[in-house]
Amino acid sequence: MQPKIPWPNNKQFAFTIFDDTDRANLKDNQLVYQCLNELNFKTTKSVWMTDGNKPTKDSGVTCDDKIYLNWLLELKNKGFEIGYHNTTYHSSYRQEIKEGLEKFVKIFNHSPAVMANHSANQENIYWGSHRVSGSRRAIYNILTRFKKNKFYKGHNESSPYFWGDLCRKHITYVRNFVFSDINTLKCCPFMPYRDLTKPYVNYWFASSEGNNVKMFNKCVSDKNQDRLEEEGGACIMYTHFADGFCQNGELSEKFKKQMKRLSKKNGWFVPVSTLLDFLKKEIKAQEINPKQRRALEWKWLFDKLILGST
């Protein structure tokens, strides 16, 4: 059994959210984050830096929208974290990625501490079949019908999509595996971790599955909240706040109810990188070994069979 973490300020557990910006719009975002702020949750909101020139099904508002950008800066001033979700909602070449990262630094006065790959983008780093190794890669390719075997090239130095050195320079934490369990730390007790087989990423972290409002509310059920508290664990929920949390200008009542209940517990509610910075010192962040990597990959593949895309 993993020993309990002595959380800051005598808190009993930790909880945060990484909000994937796919399909986001300002009006719905404002409703969600007003609720989170009122309940004293400080979480991570990812962004795209520029409007793309090829609209996709995932297209959403970007930092090119001045009203949205001003709202992001207000959000940051309230204690929320701004994370990175690639340059835009479609593939970008190296120079475009470089310019996107420089724009992030210029706007927010620091590099993005935390990021998640956007599934449609070829510049994703160590993504698709490259997330796993050995026999797990073969199984992954069968599950995905080999569609993502050689699609992602962000770590490939010979590719025009290569930006591995820029990732290592700018970004501290990159999200990889997602699990159905609310206690992310229980699933990945050594996060954040280094992986010597993936040298362009400084540290990896895992998360818990809350892809849309239904899955989010299921993961933060009363029973799961209580268990997270009892286990003294840490949850990094991965979600898309654009997916069902707001309908006709109204925020999900179930979401509000669950988050209000959670807010009354003695939890540490900080942004993703704040939580990972603490864990890095507390756990003395390490290089993952082959045995740990195998176990993590098998667990993720098992969850993937149940959850689908993670």
Where are these regions (language model features)?
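A solvent-exposed, charged loop/short amphipathic helix patch at secondary-structure junctions
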Residues: 204-206
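Catalytic alpha-helical scaffold of carbohydrate-active enzymes acting on polysaccharides/glycoconjugates
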Residues: 1-201, 214-238, 244-310
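Propeptides and adjacent flexible N-terminal/non-core segments of secreted
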Residues: 209-212
